[in-house]
From Swiss-Prot:
One of the record's GO molecular function terms: oxidoreductase activity, acting on NAD(P)H
Recorded family membership: Belongs to the YCR102c/YLR460c/YNL134c family.
Domain of life: Eukaryota
Annotated CDD domains: enoyl_reductase_like (cd08249)
Miscellaneous comment as given in the Swiss-Prot or TrEMBL entry: Present with 3490 molecules/cell in log phase SD medium.
InterPro entries named among the record's database cross-references: ADH-like_C, ADH-like_N, GroES-like_sf, NAD(P)-bd_dom_sf, PKS_ER, Trans-enoyl_RdTase-like
GO terms, biological process: response to furfural
Protein name as annotated: Uncharacterized protein YNL134C
């Protein structure tokens, strides 16, 4: 069963090292458990431009990982009791994928796994605003800002660090602090909210620009250190010399060194990063036996092997099941207003704005906000 669907569409693809808007792109085929949406809103992520610049995504692959829209077709073995044509959903897509290059969020139609899709409790549409302050999810612009960052944050806290999915327990699950470096990033803001609601740690320490302090403390941060301070690491270590849980929400070769230095002196400590950084990226003289570096790559959510640059990440069924469990747990909390979307800036020219949107992310023109494009 399906609505009227064209044979081709407009989409943003990788072409000669750039994000290029193209016409006459085939509509993606539906694999088992997937639904096809007519895309209404999309959001950008650093991984989008990195797939281009680092040559991870193949030539001609469709870009984009966050999409929201209306279901127009159900694929094989989709639970018809949960999903129907006409429903609005939002979710994660592996854009610029080697395995599935014909599917990406930055397109008029996208395929989303029904197993990992988010679904609003009531139908909502575009609000039409240029900017959205942070708040409960009441529009598609707000909804589409969530999937990649919220699911990543959930996987870090519940899968990497093993927190129970218990909402607002009276006692902290870990009687130790956690540090989020890049607390104002999209993932950082989700981590703070989740860590607070799960009461995961004795203290939530964040590193971010001082201008974001009010919002981040409203989300649940206990203390903020400004990364602009030349002695920020010394400030942190002076007050907290035994932080066993750390997340590098920026995850580049500079920040991983900084976060690593903040790790506990006397306890075993784990630094979680969001790309493929390892101990080899730490200066040899700074490496310590008690500090390990782990990663979380949301692309494993699909349950398949993931070709990623020069290597392939093996399929991780446990990761996929953990993600499905987390989304099932957190979806009602979003619908109840317990989890907020972060500030959103909206681009109004649809897919034509995507090259500029990605350039703005790449060059840091957004600060503490998610960049969203709405399709006409």
């Amino acid at each position: 069963m399906s609505a009227s669907i064209p044979e081709t569409m407009k989409a943003v693809v990788i072409e000669n090292g750039k994000a290029v808007v193209k016409q006459d792109i085939p509509i993606p085929e539906l694999e088992e458990g997937f639904v096809l949406i007519k895309t209404v809103a999309v959001a950008g992520n650093p991984t989008d431009w990195k797939h281009i610049d680092f040559k991870i995504g193949p030539q001609g692959a469709l870009l984009g990982c966050d999409a929201a829209g209306q279901i127009v077709k159900l694929g094989p073995n989709v639970d018809a009791a949960r999903f129907a044509i006409g429903d609005y959903i939002y979710g994660v897509i592996h854009g610029a994928s080697v395995r599935f290059p014909s599917n990406g969020a930055f397109a008029e139609y996208s395929a989303i796994s029904s197993e990992t899709a988010y679904k609003p409790a009531r139908e909502f549409r575009l609000c039409g605003k240029d900017k959205l302050p942070e708040g409960p999810v009441k529009s598609l612009e707000g909804a589409v800002s969530l999937p990649v960052s919220l699911t990543t944050a959930g996987m870090i806290l519940t899968h990497s660090f093993g927190l129970d999915m218990t909402w607002k327990p009276s006692k902290a699950q870990r009687d130790q602090p956690i540090l989020f470096w890049g607390g104002a990033t999209a993932v950082g803001q989700m981590l703070i909210q989740l860590a607070k609601k799960l009461n995961g740690f004795s203290k939530i320490i964040v590193v971010a620009s001082r201008k974001h302090e009010k919002l981040l403390k409203e989300y649940g941060a206990d203390e903020l250190f400004d990364y602009h301070d030349a002695d920020v690491i010394e400030q942190i270590k002076k007050k907290y010399n035994n932080i066993p849980y750390l997340v590098d929400c920026v995850s580049n070769t500079e920040t991983i060194q900084q976060v690593y230095k903040c790790a506990a002196d006397d306890l075993d400590a784990t630094v979680v990063q969001l790309t493929v950084l390892t101990e080899k990226d730490i200066k040899e003289e700074d490496r310590r036996q008690n500090v390990s570096i782990e990663g979380t790559l949301l692309y494993l959510i699909g349950g398949n092997d993931v070709p990623f640059g020069t290597f392939t990440l093996p399929a991780d069924p446990e990761y996929k099941e953990a993600a499905i469990k987390f989304i099932k747990f957190i979806n009602p909390k979003i619908n109840d207003g317990e989890i907020h979307h972060i500030p959103v800036k909206v681009y109004k020219n649809g897919l034509d704005d995507i090259p500029q949107l990605l350039d703005d992310i790449k060059h840091g023109r957004n600060s503490g906000e998610k960049l969203v494009a709405v399709l006409k």
